[in-house]
Amino acid sequence: MTLNPYAAADVSAKPQNEMEARALVRTASRLNALKENWPPKKEDLNTALELNRKLWAFFLSEVCDERNPLPHDIKQNIFNLAHFIFKHTFNIQAKPSASSLDVLININMNIARGLNEQSKFKAEQAAKSGGATA
């Protein structure tokens, strides 16, 4: 099994934020499946948590890149979220509980929702201006 967050995503001609949203939803779904079938095998829990951690490590590396055009406050928020997720993941591994997964699931789903709304907005703007979607 690969731990690449984008391995299963259809990356052909998809904007970055749509791929990121899809990866967040898939990771949240995986965590939710573990929560609904509690208690999971320790290996399955650790694999899902590691996948989520790697996804957030990717986001962290992206916002730390000087070439990233996001505003500083958004970069800082993502940076802080990533660190919170790393700490919370460690706490889950130390003391696993089904309810502790809710925080990670909710963060991923809310960020994915925002990314999808951004994609929709960009597509609508491009359609209004007669340009291609970005």
Segments (PLM) and residue ranges:
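N-terminal intrinsically disordered, cationic/polar leader segments
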Residues: 1-65, 69, 76-134
